[in-house]
Amino acid sequence: MEEREESISFVDQRFLGSKPLDDTNVLEYFSGSPFYDKSCNNEILKMQTQFRGLDQKSKLFSMVGIFYEVESSNHEKTLFVIRKAYNHGDTAETLGMYYIIHGHVYAAPTNYSIYRCRMGDSMWQLNSFIDRMMEKRRFNPFSPPKGRRLAKSLEDSKDLDFMMEIFNDFKKEQAES
């Protein structure tokens, strides 16, 4: 089973020991990571221009296919954001984002993984609330129903108060932890 990009990281201590990362060599460093596609346009241009000294950046945006570019970096050169994109000719579609923090390369989470994580957290919270409510609730399916409507409406309001009390207790516990 292939490991998901979001769960792995990469660091090359040998590269970092030989020279510090900056805007000129960060893509070279990134090319050694498992996130880098060796068949991208950056590699093709590197082979074609390595002895000619041509500007790769201007050629890169005119080629159709996958390419990588440094999207941004901070002033201290400890954080770099790298964009993986597919150039269709007239437009470029972002395929992924990666970031390098102090030499460690990570894949940025996708919208899907963020939503999935948030939904999982929400479901866990809801399940915890229901479990807590069921611990405090005294329900007997075999008890006979109340005959009068007034008694029923009073019981419903007690149930609502009871549920609100449990919910507020649960919210307080979550805020404290």
UniProtKB/Swiss-Prot annotation:
It holds the Pfam family Med6. The keyword Transport does not apply. It comes from the Eukaryota. One of its GO terms (cellular component) is mediator complex. GO terms for biological process: regulation of transcription by RNA polymerase II. Keywords: Activator, Nucleus, Transcription, Transcription regulation. One of its GO terms (molecular function) is transcription coregulator activity. Belongs to the Mediator complex subunit 6 family. Component of the Mediator complex, a coactivator involved in the regulated transcription of nearly all RNA polymerase II-dependent genes. Mediator functions as a bridge to convey information from gene-specific regulatory proteins to the basal RNA polymerase II transcription machinery. Mediator is recruited to promoters by direct interactions with regulatory proteins and serves as a scaffold for the assembly of a functional preinitiation complex with RNA polymerase II and the general transcription factors. This is Mediator of RNA polymerase II transcription subunit 6. It comes from Encephalitozoon cuniculi (strain GB-M1) (Microsporidian parasite). The gene is MED6.
